[in-house]
């Protein structure tokens, strides 16, 4: 039997698998001719972009609920090796699987430098498990002796994830530490750049800065973290901040599986792909999501985001089947780009274009953000094969 292996079950991986199943149906390929298999280290599709939120109950979807109805198999294991010449992947269990075509969609991870104490005492919201660990840690602090350090969180990295995390935390801390003991919850956002939201542009920056003020978030810019301890952080300036919680949100890098391929990668570790999501220089391999640097238009490459990962997955899934059956491949182009950043109780900010011009802010932008986070980025959850495959069509959604 011919086999398509998809590595990863995040936004790109899920939609690549469903996109492949949809295209097989569309071509009326007889059942049992092509096996579509997802290999990932968890039996879940995680809504990773919501990990900064206080309520994580809707952030994890059993893969069986969305792959099963589509006839897509799933293997719960971490892929440890890719043999591109032999067209075979090996997993942490020792099992190996041959493939006729491969879609690499193993995502990205937060970069944690070798700072003293970071690995031992730092937290993150990079994964669902990491977000749960942070949640449990904060709940544990709230049940213990109430000190200023216990009620203080330092967030490192003032990019999008760091800003959303910092803006969400004041509400969480006030709910957890509302015991009337005279201790005021404190959130401090740190970044080595001279200002927060360095990638958000001049239009959005004042909105973000005001939101941080409104949320009571302190900032330290132009400094970096030198060391982390159970009691806080030491900054490059020499300042020490007493805090029982340090959340690391600084920097992302593509899955280490990209390092196994004999081709060039960009500064984020991403593979170069062509307009059809084929990995340039590696036969029979496609890539989608955070592991791939795909051209969105004549000037811009894809951004590590579900905004780009989902359509990249859909197109890769369609094209991997087209490639198997000598059908024309579909070029992916996304003619627009938006950013909708959650600012906690201050609402949100919505920007359009690569220059990130603000078009909405406050409560209206918050409504859009909530719609994205709770509906737009989810697969159909009604168990309908028809609905799942229809949602996997190779198309680009309109602006939210």
UniProtKB/Swiss-Prot annotation:
Highest taxon of source: Bacteria
Cofactor list: FAD
InterPro entries from the UniProt entry: FAD/NAD-bd_sf, FAD/NAD-binding_dom, NADH-Q_oxidoreductase
Induction: A member of the dormancy regulon. Induced in response to reduced oxygen tension (hypoxia) and low levels of nitric oxide (NO).
Keyword Oxidoreductase on entry: yes
EC number of the protein: 1.6.-.-
GO terms assigned for molecular function: NAD(P)H dehydrogenase (quinone) activity
Cofactor mode of binding and number, as noted: Binds 1 FAD per subunit.
Gene Ontology biological-process entries: aerobic electron transport chain
Top EC class for this record: oxidoreductase
Family the entry assigns: Belongs to the NADH dehydrogenase family.
Protein name as annotated: NADH dehydrogenase-like protein MT1860
Organism: Mycobacterium tuberculosis (strain CDC 1551 / Oshkosh)
Source organism phylogeny: Bacteria, Bacillati, Actinomycetota, Actinomycetes, Mycobacteriales
């Amino acid at each position: 039997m011919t086999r398509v292996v998809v590595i990863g079950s995040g936004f790109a991986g899920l939609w690549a698998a469903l996109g492949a199943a949809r295209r097989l149906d569309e071509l009326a390929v007889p059942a049992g001719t092509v096996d579509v298999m997802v290999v990932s280290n968890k039996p879940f599709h995680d809504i990773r972009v919501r990990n900064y939120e206080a309520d994580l109950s809707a952030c994890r979807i059993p893969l069986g609920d969305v792959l099963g109805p589509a006839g897509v198999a799933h293997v719960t294991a971490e892929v440890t090796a890719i043999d591109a010449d032999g067209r075979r992947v090996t997993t942490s269990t020792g099992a190996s699987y041959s493939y006729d075509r491969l879609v690499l969609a193993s995502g990205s991870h937060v970069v944690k430098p070798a700072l003293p104490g970071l690995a031992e005492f730092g937290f993150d919201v990079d994964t669902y498990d990491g977000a749960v660990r942070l949640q449990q840690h904060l709940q544990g602090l709230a049940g213990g002796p109430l000190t200023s350090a216990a009620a203080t969180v330092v967030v490192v990295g003032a990019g999008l994830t760091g800003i959303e995390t910092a803006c969400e935390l004041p509400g969480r801390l006030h709910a957890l530490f509302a015991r009337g003991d005279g201790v005021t919850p404190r959130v401090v956002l740190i970044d080595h750049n001279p200002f927060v939201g360095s990638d958000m542009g001049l239009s959005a920056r004042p909105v973000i800065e005001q939101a941080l003020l409104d949320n009571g978030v302190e900032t330290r810019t132009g400094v970096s973290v030198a060391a982390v301890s159970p009691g806080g952080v030491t900054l490059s300036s020499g300042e020490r901040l007493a805090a029982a919680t340090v959340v690391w949100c600084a920097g992302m890098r593509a899955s280490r599986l990209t390092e196994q391929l004999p081709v060039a990668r960009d500064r984020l570790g991403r593979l170069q792909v062509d307009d059809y999501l084929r990995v340039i220089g590696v036969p029979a391999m496609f890539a989608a999501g955070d592991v791939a640097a795909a051209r969105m238009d004549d000037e811009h490459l894809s951004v590590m985001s579900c905004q780009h990962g989902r359509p990249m997955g859909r197109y890769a899934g369609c094209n991997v089947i087209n490639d198997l059956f000598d059908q024309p491949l579909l070029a992916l182009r996304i003619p627009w780009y938006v950013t909708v950043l959650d600012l906690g109780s201050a609402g949100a900010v919505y920007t359009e274009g690569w220059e990130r011009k603000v078009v909405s802010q406050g409560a209206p932008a918050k409504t859009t953000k909530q719609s994205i986070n709770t509906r737009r980025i989810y697969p159909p959850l009604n168990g309908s094969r028809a609905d799942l495959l229809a949602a996997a069509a190779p198309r680009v959604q309109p602006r939210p």
